[in-house]
Amino acid sequence: PTAYASIDPANPPKIATHNFIDLDPYIRITKIRAVYGHNYNYGSPEYDLTGTSCSSMKHYLDAYTSDQRWDGNFGSYDTRGVVKFYSPVDGNMHTVVPQETEQGTEYQFYIYPTDYQRLTFTFHHVDLLEEFVSGGSVTAGQHIGYIMRPNGQGEIAVSINNGVNLQYISFFDVMTDEVFAEYQARGITSRDQMTISKEERAANPIPCTLGDGYGGKFYSASGDQEAFNEWQSGPDNWVELE
């Protein structure tokens, strides 16, 4: 295939030959179109300018329970500087954007697979190895950095640029069977269970506060924020690992 050939979002190539992160410490993962974190679908047809129906098109991986997050009681284990990120593919790291935090400089960046330039892997909040702060070529499985934030989560977004807009898909849609086997060993039974369908999300629209400076935080349309928070932490949005 030519590197710039179009890609079918419903049937993307399974090119991620390595997991993007150390899976061992993680106990739960959000689904695509979950309402956790903040609205994340900018540049796609699903982006709702009114903030009426919002969703996150990235997977969050958490090593802690929702109770630990609420209480700030993480115990002795800290993911920061311990959990490693890897390149899932042979490709190039581009658009490396630094951001200063209390802990130092963290980075957001894109990895474009060599053979599929319309596909993009987006990484956030990474303590990047020094050799990559200007980008450059990467190989599948290459260690590129660590979790930056204290008790930080893992995050990954995958998008297809069709020349007009972006279409976000799941990391599970592009991983090889060998990589998926790592997740199967932790109780994931199908790739599909990691995505809430567009139709399902539209049938249960969740609003967010666009323009809030935080990327658009989700909130309860009914006003019962406590019940909403509990639902947000539950199985409609998260898949528990074994």
Report each predicted region and the residues it spans.
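Surface-exposed, glycine-biased beta-strand/turn segments
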Residues: 3-107, 139-140, 191-242
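Intrinsic-disorder/low-complexity peptide segments enriched for small residues
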Residues: 21, 126, 170-173, 239
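Short, solvent-exposed loop/turn segments at the edges of secondary structure
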Residues: 53-58, 104-106, 116-118, 151-155, ...
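Zn2+-dependent peptidoglycan hydrolase active-site motif and core
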Residues: 80-82, 86-131, 153-158
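Short, well-ordered loop/turn sites that connect or cap secondary structure elements
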Residues: 88, 132, 137-138, 144
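Short acidic, gly/pro-rich beta-turn/loop elements at beta-sheet edges
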Residues: 101, 133, 166-168
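Short hydrophobic beta/alpha edge segments that flank linear recognition/processing sites
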Residues: 106-111, 138-162, 168, 173
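Polybasic, proline/glycine-rich intrinsically disordered low-complexity segments
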Residues: 160-208
